[in-house]
From Swiss-Prot:
Source organism of the structure: Lactococcus lactis subsp. lactis (strain IL1403)
Swiss-Prot/TrEMBL keywords: Cell membrane, Ion transport, Membrane, Potassium, Potassium transport, Symport, Transmembrane, Transmembrane helix, Transport
Gene behind the chain: kup2
Protein name: Probable potassium transport system protein Kup 2
Record-annotated membrane-spanning stretches: 18-38, 60-80, 103-123, 146-166, 173-193, 218-238, 252-272, 292-312, 343-363, 373-393, 402-422, 424-444
Bilayer disposition of the protein: Multi-pass membrane protein
Length: 671
């Protein structure tokens, strides 16, 4: 997904620069589908020798109308209107409708997980398909092993450069994709003249006829191959916030025409050569003159790399959103560029690299990868349709319109899903297993948070103000820090997590001039940055609610610096004069952040399922990042404390003092 978030005022505008940005960011996946989609369709029919005119016309017609109904109607005309403060994607859509039904978190988790799983296979199939074009260059192509090695080298380079950001090469994405789509359109138009009867495919009759025709050897399951042409449609919606609605509205017609011309050109070539026997045919490269193949392989490889980069960046964004929505554990996130939205997650990058490389080694050829492709993304689209239905209800769309749109989309996408199920035994089970693993982690993380919130005990801080005030003046204790800051996940007005007061008063009394209690609330809006302060009628207790959008960095110290300045300037917080400082006139004291981690106690009192969830979460936490880096505390003084998560009053265990017994025989002997 993209690297540039457009200003609100330009969201609905289209510009030439925005047009190029959209080409480079949004359409990589769907724009490289001509590399392999028609190849999969022909292979499913048993090869070029088994193709008839009606089959070719029907297949191209299915392609055209799939692009029209799924990409144009669902995503461009409907989904793009479901923006969350100009942001798109399945998690942005979920935040719009999650208050309507609690169970809507289920399609959000399933859709997000399958989209992530699909993101691991897309780079493998696109780059492999591009490199396989060398089969037509006999003096260069040696064998499939060479293709695999070349693909692995390209993918390794692509994943290795992620830590440096993509801003430098990203500027080339738009112009390269403009050349790519221009080539698709021009070459497709030229090849269409091989047999102009291919234009009949615009008529949907041929698409419907093919589904029920005895000439269609794959039958209904041909839809599994047809769906490959629109797998990138979900990315179009996900990148809404990075390019703007206006630029997508203007660029999609250009992209769609070029893609359709490419498929028509391939179809016309198939019509002109039907009945021939050609081994391992890929119509995309077969239509080219021999002296052009090497150049097109280079161009298609660049397009495949750009498509892969978009999927990788999109995976980073998707994971970061899931973390902020408490659907995934914390991972270390870096921001290698200066542009908003540009991020890098090492753990996700490594997982994608390993998984993508595994797919290349396991499937070996693009033909085998295609057989496993698209099942996961059909599930994502069905989940998006579910959430879209509730969005339309929320917006007050007429019921008849909702029924037509929802039933129509469920029928179409349900058909593609059913047709793709046959791919399960052809390798799609691996992608499904990856998606299930992600769903499992999401479920554990989300459910465990709810369980902990249920058991956490809260105390009224008003009842402890006198103790805190006495402690801050009690010179028998060393000054722990001028300002002590506690991050808490549960704070409701004057009620605060018991473990925090336990840490201040019981574990080791922490004398400070000011006690801060900070709670970060993730808002449904993507780029909110607001705060609310309650001094609790004191000048030494500060309750801070930080309201941050689900795409904002949660760097607490940087926000606190602004809040402290605001409070001191307004007179609500006394200035903390520093006698020793390299900063003349410094009025703010030192800070120590205390991160309290609660450890499960007396777990046997908990129901078995809840105990399993919390214990599983504890195991997952061992391999994930700590809150220190997530909250931007790595350059601050931090103390991490472990306190018990008490489910109920701990029952004292019975025990009796053992009294010394005097041996009777020994007692008699002494007398």
């Amino acid at each position: 997904m993209g690297q540039v978030h457009l200003h609100n005022r330009s969201f609905n505008k289209a510009t030439s620069a925005g047009f190029l940005i959209a080409l480079g960011i949004v359409y990589g996946d769907i724009g490289t589908s001509p590399l392999y989609a028609m190849q999969a369709i022909v292979r499913g029919q048993g090869g070029l020798a088994n193709l008839s005119e009606s089959f070719i016309l029907g297949a191209v017609s299915l392609v055209i109308w799939t692009l029209t109904l799924i990409t144009t109607v669902k995503y461009v005309l409907i989904a793009l209107k479901a923006d969350n403060h100009h942001e798109g994607g399945i998690f942005s859509l979920f935040t719009l409708v999650r208050r309507m039904r609690k169970w809507l978190i289920i399609p959000a988790m399933i859709g997000g997980a399958t989209l992530l799983a699909d993101g691991a296979l897309t780079p493998a199939v696109t780059v492999t398909s591009a490199i396989e074009g060398l089969r037509g260059v006999t003096h260069v192509y040696s064998n499939q092993t060479a293709v695999m090695v070349t693909t692995l080298i390209i993918l390794a380079f692509l994943f290795l450069i992620q830590r440096f950001g993509a801003s430098l090469v990203g500027r080339l994405f738009g112009p390269i994709m403009f050349i790519w789509f221009g080539f698709l359109g021009v070459s497709g138009l030229i090849n269409s003249f091989l047999d102009l009867s291919i234009l009949k495919a615009i008529n949907p009759y041929y698409a419907i006829h093919l589904l029920f025709s005895p000439e269609n050897k794959a039958g209904f399951f041909i839809l599994g191959s047809i769906f490959l042409v629109t797998t990138g449609a979900e990315a179009l919606y996900s990148d809404l916030g990075h390019v703007g609605r206006g630029n997508i509205y203007v660029s999609w017609p250009f992209v769609k025409i070029c893609i359709i011309l490419s498929y028509c050109g391939q179809g016309a070539w198939l019509l002109a050569h039907r009945g021939e026997h050609i081994e391992k045919l890929n119509p995309f490269f077969a239509v080219l003159p021999d002296n052009m193949v090497i150049y097109v392989v280079i161009l298609s490889t660049l397009a495949a790399i750009i498509a892969s980069q978009a999927l990788i960046s999109g995976s980073f964004t998707l994971v970061s959103e899931a973390i902020r929505l408490k659907l995934l554990p914390l991972f270390k996130i870096y921001y290698p560029g200066q542009t908003l939205g540009q991020l890098y997650i090492p753990a996700v990058n490594f997982a994608l690299w390993v998984t993508t490389s595994f797919f290349v080694l396991y499937f070996k050829t693009s033909e085998h990868m295609e057989a496993a492709y698209s099942l996961a993304i059909t599930i994502t689209m069905l989940m998006t349709t579910t959430l879209l239905t509730y969005f339309l209800i929320q917006k007050g769309t007429p019921k008849i319109a909702i029924a037509i749109i929802s039933i129509g989309l469920f029928c179409i996408e349900g058909s593609f899903f059913a047709a793709s199920l046959v791919q399960f035994i052809n390798g799609a089970y691996i992608v499904v297993l990856i998606a299930l693993a992600i769903i499992f982690v999401m479920f554990i993380w989300n459910k465990s948070h709810k369980i902990v919130m249920k058991y956490i005990k809260s105390l009224n801080i008003n009842e402890y103000k006198n103790q805190l005030n006495a402690l801050r003046h009690d010179e028998s204790y060393d000054l722990y820090q001028t300002n002590v800051v506690y991050l808490t996940s549960k704070m409701d007005h004057e009620w605060i997590d018991r473990s925090i007061l336990y840490s201040i008063l019981d574990k080791r009394p922490k004398r400070a001039e000011c006690y801060w209690f900070v709670n970060v609330k993730v808002t449904d809006e993507p780029y909110t940055s607001e705060y609310k302060v309650d001094m609790m009628d004191t000048d030494f207790i500060v309750r801070v609610n930080l309201y941050l959008g689900f795409r904002m960095r949660q760097e607490v110290p940087r926000y606190l610096r602004t809040i402290v300045t605001d409070l001191m300037e307004s007179g609500r917080l006394p200035r903390q004069h520093q006698h020793y400082s390299i900063t003349p006139g410094r009025k703010v004291g030192d800070f120590r952040f205390v991160v309290v981690e609660e450890k499960l106690m007396n777990a046997r009192q908990m129901p078995g399922f809840e105990r399993f969830v919390l214990q599983t979460k504890a195991q997952i936490k061992r391999i994930t990042a700590s809150p220190i880096r997530w909250f931007g505390l790595q350059f601050s003084e931090v103390t991490v404390e472990t306190v018990p998560l008490v489910l109920s009053d701990v029952r004292n265990l019975e025990i009796h003092e053992r009294l010394e017994q005097v041996d009777e025989a020994e007692a008699s002997a002494t007398h």
